[in-house]
């Protein structure tokens, strides 16, 4: 189990516990449950890379303690 930090740059930071083999879409559902946002509106980025919903966190090399940028569409 890993813990990933999501920051929306508007003052909201969320720590989410998940498995490395979870897809980004599953991870968005966990983030949405904590923030009260629709998971379809959440866009996760690291630098300028936008993460696709069907790829796993391990494939994107997201590890324990890593921070992701969260945007709303």
UniProtKB/Swiss-Prot annotation:
The alphabetical list of record keywords is:
Cytoplasm, mRNA processing, mRNA splicing, Nucleus, Ubl conjugation pathway
UniProt GO cellular component terms: cytoplasm; cytosol; nucleus
The record's GO molecular-function terms, alphabetically, read: protein tag activity
Q: What is its main location?
A: nucleus
Q: Name one Pfam family in it.
A: ubiquitin
Gene Ontology BP terms: mRNA cis splicing, via spliceosome; mRNA splicing, via spliceosome; protein modification process
Places the protein is found: Nucleus; Cytoplasm
Q: Where is the Ubiquitin-like domain?
A: 1-73
Cystine pairs annotated here are none
Top-level taxon in the UniProt lineage? Eukaryota
The record's annotation in InterPro entries points to:
Hub1/Ubl5, Ubiquitin-like_dom, Ubiquitin-like_domsf
Q: Describe the function of this protein.
A: Forms a conjugate with snu66 and facilitates its localization to the nucleus. Involved in morphogenesis. Required for efficient splicing of pre-mRNA.
Q: Which PANTHER family match?
A: UBIQUITIN-LIKE PROTEIN 5
User: What is the protein named?
Assistant: Ubiquitin-like modifier hub1
Origin organism is: Schizosaccharomyces pombe (strain 972 / ATCC 24843) (Fission yeast)
Lineage start: Eukaryota, Fungi, Dikarya, Ascomycota, Taphrinomycotina
The primary gene name is: hub1
């Amino acid at each position: 189990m890993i813990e990933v930090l999501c920051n929306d740059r508007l003052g909201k930071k969320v720590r989410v516990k998940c498995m490395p083999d979870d897809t980004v879409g599953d991870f968005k559902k966990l983030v949405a449950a904590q923030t009260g946002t629709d998971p379809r509106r959440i866009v996760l980025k690291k630098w300028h890379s936008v993460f696709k919903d069907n790829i796993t966190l391990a494939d994107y090399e997201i590890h324990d303690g890593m921070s992701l940028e969260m945007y709303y569409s």
